[in-house]
């Protein structure tokens, strides 16, 4: 890796570190926070579903911002939107706001996150290629995931401990402060490199054009299409499980106010993410095809969730949680690399946002569905149901594998891609949340 690529990597890791610390202050306590505000299980997960619906609604428009105005602008808008909507969450908790207010602000939170989804990853990939980096993207993205895991570990443990020492609202205020700081950091360090925004005076036309391009390079590209069709099941389950584990583990532990235990659960996921990021390049070398890693990860993850559904021992549940997180974390950089190697630079942010949209759309349905299941049958049963839903993703991943795309075997960064993956004359195999 040359000096220019190292600088790009350092900026990427810095942004990842700060943003993840900000987000993870509340990850371990978010569901408990909503329940403490007076929401039922169904309402709490419905609020999360409205957050996800916001991501679905704004993925393409914010992708237009990233591709038309620059990834840096998109990132800055994301930090401000998230800071403002997080503060509104704190205010609503204080006044025990009605559900409709939680729904509205949750949509705004979703808007904030869509400014990030696709934009940072697209910025990284284009900047690395511009710098002359020819290595595999799994390595850089794996490091990003390790940094994300460390940040999540620090933030989630701190959030849980601070909540127990003070109250459930303080971690939300800390998140606002860190996001404001990240705005300043990004303003100073993040600049679009290797990418020239194409601005349009007609935003609606730009949205339609970019949406069409994302469909052409996404859903109309068979290897990408099947991975995207798997996303609603795997991503929807992942979102639900992460937040359901908080009250589930507190119930097993026997103390509904042991918020540090909820932070511990998020910390275990974070530590597993570090390990998973480290294992990603190794997992890639162990298998001839990237899709083999994805298929195995989905099957093993589903089995673990089914077992969690029948577990009544706290410490066994923690071990299973760690295994589930490691498996998912090891597969994530491989999936990123696979998808990035199949899409062209100009539409990269939008196609990645569209991919995120597909996953979010599953969360809109899966979260309230499983939340209602938790109300009726308990959290263990809802986790078992989540395992069944996860299995549905496997046939789509198998279908993607059958397309025999060059990116499925790729191990280094490609110079360019057409709709089907390879560059027109030469394809230098390459990789890429």
Task: Give residue ranges: language-model regions.
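C-terminal transmembrane bundle of multi-pass solute transporters/carriers
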Residues: 10, 45-47, 57, 239, ...
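Helix-loop junctions on the cytosolic side of multi-pass membrane transporters
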Residues: 168, 175, 180-203, 398-409
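C-terminal ends and interior cores of transmembrane alpha-helices
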Residues: 76, 80-96, 102, 299-312
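Cytoplasmic helix-loop-helix junction between adjacent transmembrane helices
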Residues: 105-149
């Amino acid at each position: 890796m040359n000096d220019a690529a190292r600088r790009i990597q350092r900026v990427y890791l810095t942004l990842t570190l700060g943003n993840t610390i900000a987000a993870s202050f509340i990850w371990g306590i978010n569901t408990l926070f909503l329940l403490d505000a007076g929401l039922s299980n169904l309402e709490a997960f419905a609020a999360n579903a409205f957050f996800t619906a916001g991501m679905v609604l704004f993925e393409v428009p914010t992708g237009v911002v990233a591709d038309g105005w620059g990834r840096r602008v998109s990132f800055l808008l994301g930090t401000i939107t998230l800071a403002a909507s997080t503060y509104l969450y704190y205010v609503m908790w204080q006044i025990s706001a009605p559900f409709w207010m939680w729904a509205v602000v949750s949509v705004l939170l979703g808007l904030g996150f869509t400014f990030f989804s696709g934009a940072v990853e697209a910025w990284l990939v284009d900047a690395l290629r511009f710098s002359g980096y020819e290595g595999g993207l799994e390595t850089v993205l794996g490091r990003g995931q390790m940094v994300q895991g460390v940040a999540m570990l620090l933030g989630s443990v701190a959030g849980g401990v601070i909540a127990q020492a003070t109250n459930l609202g303080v971690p939300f205020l800390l998140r606002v402060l860190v996001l404001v700081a990240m705005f300043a950091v990004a303003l100073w360090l993040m600049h679009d490199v290797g990418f020239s925004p194409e601005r349009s005076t007609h935003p609606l036309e730009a949205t339609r054009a970019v949406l069409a391009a994302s469909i052409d390079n996404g859903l109309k590209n068979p290897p990408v299409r099947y991975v995207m069709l798997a996303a609603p099941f795997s991503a929807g389950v992942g979102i639900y499980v992460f937040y359901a584990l908080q009250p589930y583990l507190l119930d097993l532990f026997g103390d509904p106010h042991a918020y540090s235990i909820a932070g511990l659960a998020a910390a275990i996921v974070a530590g597993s993410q570090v390990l998973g990021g480290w294992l990603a390049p190794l997992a890639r070398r162990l298998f001839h095809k990237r899709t083999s890693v994805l298929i195995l990860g989905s099957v093993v993850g589903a089995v673990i969730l089914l077992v969690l559904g029948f577990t009544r021992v706290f410490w066994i549940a923690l071990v299973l949680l760690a295994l589930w997180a490691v498996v998912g974390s090891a597969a994530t950089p491989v999936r990123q690399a696979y998808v990035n190697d199949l899409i062209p630079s100009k539409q990269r942010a939008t196609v990645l946002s569209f991919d995120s949209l597909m996953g979010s759309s599953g969360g809109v349905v899966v979260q309230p569905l499983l939340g209602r299941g938790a109300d009726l049958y308990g959290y263990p049963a809802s986790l078992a149901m989540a395992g069944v839903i996860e299995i549905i993703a496997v046939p789509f991943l198998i279908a993607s594998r059958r397309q025999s795309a060059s990116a499925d075997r790729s191990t280094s960064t490609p110079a360019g891609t057409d709709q089907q993956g390879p560059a027109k004359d030469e394809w230098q195999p390459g990789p890429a949340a």
